[in-house]
Amino acid sequence: MLPAAAAAASLWAPRLGLRGARLRLARQQVPGVCAARQLSSSSQRRSEALAGAPLDNAPKEYPPKIQQLVQDIASLTLLEISDLNELLKKTLKIQDVGLMPMGGMMPGAVPAAAAAAPEVAEGEDILKQKERTHFTVRLTEAKPVDKVKLIKEIKNYVQGINLVQAKKLVESLPQEIKANVAKAEAEKIKAALEAVGGTVVLE
């Protein structure tokens, strides 16, 4: 039995030795494989991060809500801008459009309100002109060549005045021709006086 066992051992020894060598080689290769996998994973994550980062020269895209808000504001009339300005000042507690932004305010609210202020003021002036129903007709200038015609025309609109008084009136301009006149009549007087060389303003 001993010679048979020795023969079997000598037969399997080379195979066992080869298997052990393979195991040692595999163990040596495992760290390298892991390192390669880590490097590949890190490179992939870096590529994904670069792909997701926005480019500096790419145009900024604004949310639809902001775009719609800008379009709505741009379509407002002067009166609506005035109401918006007033409501913003009340909501954001802005005392003066010239003040620096206070805590809790939207960025750019004060500059936007300040930029809209001249347009709002102009719109309010136009509104006041539209709301007025009575005017004062005032003669401010007269052409020398047309003074005679102008004097006669003034006599038609100023009660109780004679030609001498009308002449003195024309020579000492500006003078009030008629006060508290309805819009239609004021425009009629203005047109008549301007037709004979006068310069008229409605106040």
UniProtKB/Swiss-Prot annotation:
<feature type="modified residue" description="N6-acetyllysine; alternate">
    <location>
        <position position="155"/>
    </location>
</feature>
<feature type="modified residue" description="N6-succinyllysine; alternate">
    <location>
        <position position="183"/>
    </location>
</feature>
<dbReference type="GO" id="GO:0005762">
    <property type="term" value="C:mitochondrial large ribosomal subunit"/>
</dbReference>
<feature type="modified residue" description="N6-acetyllysine">
    <location>
        <position position="178"/>
    </location>
</feature>
<feature type="modified residue" description="N6-acetyllysine">
    <location>
        <position position="168"/>
    </location>
</feature>
<feature type="modified residue" description="N6-acetyllysine">
    <location>
        <position position="143"/>
    </location>
</feature>
<dbReference type="InterPro" id="IPR008932">
    <property type="entry name" value="Ribosomal_bL12_oligo"/>
</dbReference>
<keyword id="KW-0832">Ubl conjugation</keyword>
<keyword id="KW-0689">Ribosomal protein</keyword>
<comment type="function">
    <text>As a component of the mitochondrial large ribosomal subunit, plays a role in mitochondrial translation. When present in mitochondria as a free protein not associated with the ribosome, associates with mitochondrial RNA polymerase POLRMT to activate transcription. Required for POLRMT stability.</text>
</comment>
<dbReference type="Pfam" id="PF16320">
    <property type="entry name" value="Ribosomal_L12_N"/>
</dbReference>
<comment type="similarity">
    <text>Belongs to the bacterial ribosomal protein bL12 family.</text>
</comment>
<dbReference type="InterPro" id="IPR014719">
    <property type="entry name" value="Ribosomal_bL12_C/ClpS-like"/>
</dbReference>
<dbReference type="GO" id="GO:0003729">
    <property type="term" value="F:mRNA binding"/>
</dbReference>
<feature type="modified residue" description="N6-acetyllysine">
    <location>
        <position position="130"/>
    </location>
</feature>
<dbReference type="InterPro" id="IPR000206">
    <property type="entry name" value="Ribosomal_bL12"/>
</dbReference>
<comment type="subunit">
    <text>Component of the mitochondrial ribosome large subunit (39S) which comprises a 16S rRNA and about 50 distinct proteins. Interacts with NOA1.</text>
</comment>
<keyword id="KW-0007">Acetylation</keyword>
<keyword id="KW-0687">Ribonucleoprotein</keyword>
<keyword id="KW-0496">Mitochondrion</keyword>
<feature type="transit peptide" description="Mitochondrion">
    <location>
        <begin position="1"/>
        <end position="39"/>
    </location>
</feature>
<keyword id="KW-0809">Transit peptide</keyword>
<feature type="cross-link" description="Glycyl lysine isopeptide (Lys-Gly) (interchain with G-Cter in ubiquitin)">
    <location>
        <position position="155"/>
    </location>
</feature>
<feature type="modified residue" description="N6-acetyllysine; alternate">
    <location>
        <position position="183"/>
    </location>
</feature>
<dbReference type="InterPro" id="IPR036235">
    <property type="entry name" value="Ribosomal_bL12_oligo_N_sf"/>
</dbReference>
<feature type="modified residue" description="N6-succinyllysine; alternate">
    <location>
        <position position="155"/>
    </location>
</feature>
<feature type="modified residue" description="N6-acetyllysine">
    <location>
        <position position="149"/>
    </location>
</feature>
<keyword id="KW-1017">Isopeptide bond</keyword>
<dbReference type="GO" id="GO:0006412">
    <property type="term" value="P:translation"/>
</dbReference>
<dbReference type="InterPro" id="IPR013823">
    <property type="entry name" value="Ribosomal_bL12_C"/>
</dbReference>
<feature type="modified residue" description="N6-acetyllysine">
    <location>
        <position position="190"/>
    </location>
</feature>
<dbReference type="Pfam" id="PF00542">
    <property type="entry name" value="Ribosomal_L12"/>
</dbReference>
<feature type="modified residue" description="N6-succinyllysine">
    <location>
        <position position="167"/>
    </location>
</feature>
<protein>
    <recommendedName>
        <fullName>Large ribosomal subunit protein bL12m</fullName>
    </recommendedName>
</protein>
<feature type="modified residue" description="N6-acetyllysine">
    <location>
        <position position="147"/>
    </location>
</feature>
<dbReference type="GO" id="GO:0003735">
    <property type="term" value="F:structural constituent of ribosome"/>
</dbReference>
